[in-house]
UniProtKB/Swiss-Prot annotation:
Encoding gene per record: argS
Top-level taxonomic group: Bacteria
Sequence motif 'HIGH' region, residues: 131-141
Ligase as UniProt keyword: yes
Location relative to the cell: Cytoplasm
Subunit structure: Monomer.
Source organism: Legionella pneumophila (strain Lens)
Similarity annotation: Belongs to the class-I aminoacyl-tRNA synthetase family.
Enzyme class of the recorded protein, top EC level: ligase
Protein name, entry field: Arginine--tRNA ligase
InterPro entries assigned: aa-tRNA-synth_I_CS, Arg-tRNA-ligase, Arg-tRNA-synth_N, Arg-tRNA-synth_N_sf, ArgRS_core, DALR_anticod-bd, Rossmann-like_a/b/a_fold, tRNAsynth_Ia_anticodon-bd
Length: 589
């Protein structure tokens, strides 16, 4: 069944064709027809500014165009009347029977209501979170996790074939810093008088991993501290450079431990942290289809294949012993190094190989979700994709601003390297998964987010997730009261008497639930899950107003059954929408 908005868009398109065929409008017009929900019931159910958009290319007054369009709009049983308002807006009033049909559709489709075919089974890969496996996820990662998972659910509901992927950065410098941090804490447990590097990872989890290594391996990897720091450059507290020092101590650890010994610390730290990340995300309701290892790009030759693909297309050159990508040819501010003069590939080379691999796996569309601190990566990734011969429009890069926590009006500080961060797990334990999942997606991803912990825990109408869940629970309580009072809900009787739903609150609710499929399609088309969060709050508000104003379990059986059909439809839509957001729909609160 087509949505009412889709019906109106079709009618307007036919009206345009009619005017073009009669010579009253240019044939070569390329106009996007936009239909909006009317903000005021007095202006109908839907409205369009099509006549105003056509005024300039057609060189006619908007109101005259509106009159001509309305005159040739085909008749449709769903439409009661059409009016022209203001400078040329066209307002559509739908028949109550058309609105009521949506109730029958919802009750028949249940959990499948709202699912569409916008995506036409296109294969989409969404990569998100992808935090370095160097420590627990913090609350900033949580926003990206909630956004990516919800976007995946929205796209699935809109008919896309979605794969969710976490890119594991297990081959870079940060992992070496973690490995050496664990080793140094291991030496400390052995009684060595270490001085911990300014640039090392200092969290409690580093101690815990070191303790595991000490318990399992004993002292076989112990070396005297003096041999570790002999002839090393000064660290930052002694006036040196912390980056130079940490690189030097990594090299010393690799030399003393050997390849296998250092790999032992590297792999143990990686597995421990990655297992913790997986458990954390699983508990948050975020489930990935694929955990893609950066190291695998080296092992399966993807790094070389990605670089060779750029070479074959003539997009590389050599300078001072290094291999460069001609990024400026594709709009980047400067060319990028792929292979350094020492033969080491760069992070950018891994990015090229990873995206080459994504398209090589047959995905029609790729969505990268990065933290806002990665804004510098956007252009270089897009230039690489374009240089590899792929349509730039098949890549979407979405930047998600980190969340800022507030407790009691005061900002909560966090810092990963210092170990004093607030973890995602701590946030979930404090406010619950439901509040975290909703609050994280309630705003556009590019907008800064102030996460009010006190509000997220409050049981009031000011807390949007509580307000929405309470609407669902209220409907369930009505159904329980029905049984307690010995009354029956005859669904067939209710569906036959939907014309009895004459109250304005009922008309508002019916219009709201009819919009649900449109919200899903719009949220999917624009990659904006917050549209669904806003919509559910609006629907909950409509339900609460209805609940407070109307006697739902009235004596008149036909009306009571019709109202129960409406209530169950609202409950189903709330349930479906909350499921997409990753939020539970409690039956009692």
């Amino acid at each position: 069944m087509r949505s009412m908005k889709a019906i109106i868009e079709y009618l307007l398109k036919q009206a345009l064709i009619n005017l073009q065929q009669s010579g009253e409008m240019p044939i070569d017009l390329e106009i996007e027809i936009k239909v909006e929900n009317a903000k005021d019931p007095a202006h109908g159910d839907y409205a369009t500014n099509l006549a105003l958009v056509l005024a300039k290319p057609c060189r006619q007054a908007p109101k005259v165009l509106a009159e001509r369009l309305v005159a040739v709009i085909p008749a449709d049983p769903s439409v009661e009347k059409i009016e022209i308002a203001g400078a040329g807006f066209i307002n559509f009033f739908m028949r109550s029977t058309a609105r009521s049909l949506i109730i029958s559709e919802i009750l028949n489709k249940g959990k499948e209501f709202g699912q569409g075919n916008l995506g036409q089974s296109q294969k989409v890969l969404i990569e998100f979170v992808s935090a370095n496996p160097t420590g627990p996820l913090h609350v900033g990662h949580g926003r990206g996790a909630a956004f990516g998972a919800t976007l995946g659910n929205v796209l699935k509901a809109a008919g896309y074939d979605v794969t969710l992927e976490y890119y594991v950065n297990d081959a870079g410098r940060q992992m070496n810093i973690l490995a050496v941090s664990v080793w140094l804490r291991y030496l400390e447990l052995a009684g060595e008088p270490i001085a911990f590097p300014a640039n090392g990872y200092k969290g409690q989890y580093v101690y815990e991993i070191a303790q595991e290594m000490w318990s399992e391996q004993g002292n076989q990897f112990v070396h005297p501290w003096i041999s570790v720091v002999d002839n090393l450059p000064a660290d930052e507290p002694e006036g040196g450079d912390k980056e130079t020092y940490i690189d030097a101590i990594i090299a010393r650890a690799q030399s003393l431990l050997g390849k296998d010994g250092f790999a032992n610390f590297h792999q143990h730290a990686l597995k421990t942290v990655l297992d913790d990340i997986k458990d954390d995300l699983q508990a948050f309701g975020v489930r990935f289809d694929s955990w893609f290892s950066e190291q695998s790009l080296f092992e399966d030759g993807s790094i070389g294949k990605g670089i060779q693909a750029l070479k074959d297309r003539g997009h590389t050159y050599e300078r001072e012993g290094a291999l460069w990508f001609r990024a400026t040819d594709f709009g980047d501010e400067k060319d990028r190094v792929l292979v350094r003069a020492n033969g080491q590939t760069t992070y950018f080379a891994s990015d090229v190989a990873y995206h080459w691999n994504k398209y090589d796996r047959g995905f029609d569309r790729v969505i990268d979700i990065f933290g806002a601190d990665h804004h510098g990566y956007v252009t270089r990734i897009k230039t690489a994709v374009k240089a590899l011969g792929h349509d730039e429009s098949a890549l979407d890069v979405i930047l998600v601003q980190f969340a800022i926590l507030y407790r009691g009006g005061d900002r909560v500080q966090m810092s990963t390297r210092s170990g004093s961060f607030v973890t995602l797990r701590e946030l979930r334990e404090e406010v619950g998964n439901d509040a975290a999942r909703y609050f994280y997606v309630a705003r556009k991803p590019e907008q800064h987010m102030d996460f009010d912990l006190d509000l997220a825990k409050s049981e009031s109408s000011d807390n949007p997730v509580y307000y929405i869940q309470y609407a669902h629970a209220r409907i369930c309580s009505v159904l329980r009261q029905l049984k307690e009072r010995g009354l029956k809900w005859d669904k067939d009787m209710g569906l036959k008497n939907l014309d009895l739903l004459e109250q304005q609150h009922e008309a508002t609710l019916i219009s709201l639930i009819a919009r649900y499929p449109e919200v899903i399609q719009s949220a999917a088309a624009s990659c904006e899950p917050h549209q669904l969060a806003y919509y559910l709050r609006e629907l909950a508000n409509g339900l609460h107003s209805y609940y407070n104003a109307i006697q739902l379990l009235c004596e008149q059986e036909q009306l009571r059954c019709a109202r129960l059909c409406l209530l169950e439809s609202v409950r189903q839509v709330l349930n479906n929408g909350l499921a997409i957001l990753g939020v539970s729909a409690p039956e009692s609160m």
